[in-house]
Amino acid sequence: MPLAVSFAAVPSLAQAQEGSAPAATSSKIMALPDLIDGKRIFTPAYFTADSPQNAADMVGRVPGFDIEDGDNVRGFGGAAGNVLIDGARPTSKSENLVSILSRIPANNVERIELLQGAAAGALAPGKTQVVNVVRKADAKSGGSWALQIDGVSSGFILPSLEASYTARLGRLNVTAGIETEYDDADNLVGFEGFQDPNGVFLERGPNDDRRRARYGKLTLGADGAFGAYKLSLNANWFRGAFRRNWVHVSTRTGATLPFRVDQGRETNDETNWEIGGDIERDIAGWTGKIALLAKSGDQANESLAGFNLIGAPKSFGRFLSSDMTIERVGRLTFKRKFGAHQVEVGGEYAFNSLDFVGVFAQGNGGVFIAQPGDISATQVQEARREAFVSDSWTISPTLTLEATLTGEWSTISQSGDAAKERSFFYPKPRLKAVWKPRDGWTYRGEIERDVGQLDFGAFADSASVGDGNQNSGNPELRPEQNLNYVLGVERRWGKRGVLNASVRYEQITDKLELVPTIGGGVALGNIPEATKWGYNLSLTLPLDNLLQGLEVEGSYRWRDSELNDPLTDSVRPFSGNNGNQFNANIRYDMPARKLRLGAWIWRGNHNRDYRPDQRFEWSTINNWGMFVETKAIQGLTIELGVENPDGNTFSRVRTDYRPDRRSGTISRIQYRERSTDGTWYLSVKGKF
């Protein structure tokens, strides 16, 4: 309800701010940034009060804009984010946009462009809103660094370091960076136990779950102009490790001594590398560009669990797996302006492969024996080709229309335990209209058909030994096809005021869900039809009329979905479909004192998952924190903050059915509750 009141109050607040600005603030500062050819230009002066260290700090302060990295998919087509650098999207797929922007010093940024309508479609087809970071032609050498120390109330300290340096070498701007972090030290403590169908505990006991993770990353990038050619290159190397050890001691209701000890561990070691680049030049009135990428990754995983009666011989189940992934991508595009039309044509070829070996074994914790049927080995390869043509048409100064037609051809082959080869073709049309009846108001409508990509891991067997569940591989999977409808409106006022609202509806064919197999197992399979719908609201509300420098931001996302359950044929939501998320933060800037105060809250992740004989439900999670930031020391940004200082508690309920969910007969309920430590952090950023 408070959120609804805030949104309802927007028009009157907007009118108050537009009608009477404080005497000390000029109308020019309170006005929207200049709108030129569909672009709102944010010069460095706009961000002066924020004293940004890098381009990421600047983009993060563009009102009404959130950085989106794009989808984690194979190839370039669906992986594009909503940030461009000098009019081009970064070639790297392994790095997120914030990391890339953090390596661009703020004093090397000429301007930030917020593109909408035809301007966005011309540079990034399919995107509703795009930010373009334009660097200075005479960019200077310089570097930046960030050191952060995170602490938990139990006493564990987590350090992280990022540093990058940009230098001019001949015609190239060269940037090198390093990141290293001990980024996870969760000590989850709590209890769990089994209940009868009436919710009465039959057994329960304490649980201790400790997790540790660390990673290191090296990056190198170069770009420059050589006559008519523009060149960009990038490379990165990543290595990470994860460790988890857990133990649970269970005591029957009414007893004084435990009767069973459950324990297990999980490990993951990962190494990835990526090399990519693009070259661009004008050819006969067209701007041609070719982008190339090569990446590879290796993972080794172990999952072990045992549920052992005290005094009895120990028995454990263990699942070992290793995999190697390869991706090679080439994309060629040509674009040209024909009067009111911006036309782009192109094609893409992507090759991806997965080599996977998994072994399930049982033993006493020291010696494990695998049965022949418990060994899974497979190789999956996909060759995907895509051709497209798009037209961004400026019908009038207030109306633009973007139309795209894409054809996708793919062949997926699988060798090993279940050899198979299949080919697919999918047309993917998209139509988007943007109407701006007057400055500050934008309406948009979109219709798009997109096609998901299959997770190669679903072709191979897998296991969650901690829950005692195994999934079979399915070589017959088909990708999901979505028909999406979106309507949205945006209202801007003053220097930073923004209100965004949108509704969406999705018709899904071949929805992926866990289904029972003929042999009595469980595998990922396709549901013929499903639907999903919801709305998004977001608000940036300056409150300078109440207190100079005060600002509130908030967002709310609501989703619902339905499909016919493949087992019961009843209607239910998707697995993993959380209904809503709420996020809000408030900040108070005091530029004269070079001080900023803030607080935030996040609520969401009420998920459900379904298996043929089980249902899982997770509680809603509430996170909150606050911070103080100072730039009183020349060249440094220092921030001290806390997150969930009193800790956090969440739960999971697993309901087991006999023989499966069709019967409605509950055999037992597992209740699991975990608590985390409160955390604090100290961050120091600087330049050199």
Label the model's feature ranges.
Residues 264-272, 323, 376-382, 446-500, ...:
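Outer-membrane beta-barrel signature, preferentially recognizing the C-terminal barrel domain
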Residues 17, 630-688:
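C-terminal beta-signal and adjacent terminal beta-strands/loops
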Residues 219-239, 266-420, 426, 434-436, ...:
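Face-selective signature of the C-terminal outer-membrane beta-barrel domain
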Residues 30-33, 56-92:
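Extracytoplasmic beta-strand/coil segments of soluble accessory domains associated
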Residues 55-58, 99-101, 125-147, 161:
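N-terminal periplasmic accessory domains that precede
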Residues 504-507, 525-611:
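Gram-negative outer-membrane beta-barrel transporters
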Residues 89-116, 163-165:
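Short acidic/polar hinge/loop motifs at secondary-structure boundaries
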Residues 106-142, 687:
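A beta-strand signature from Gram-negative outer-membrane beta-barrel systems
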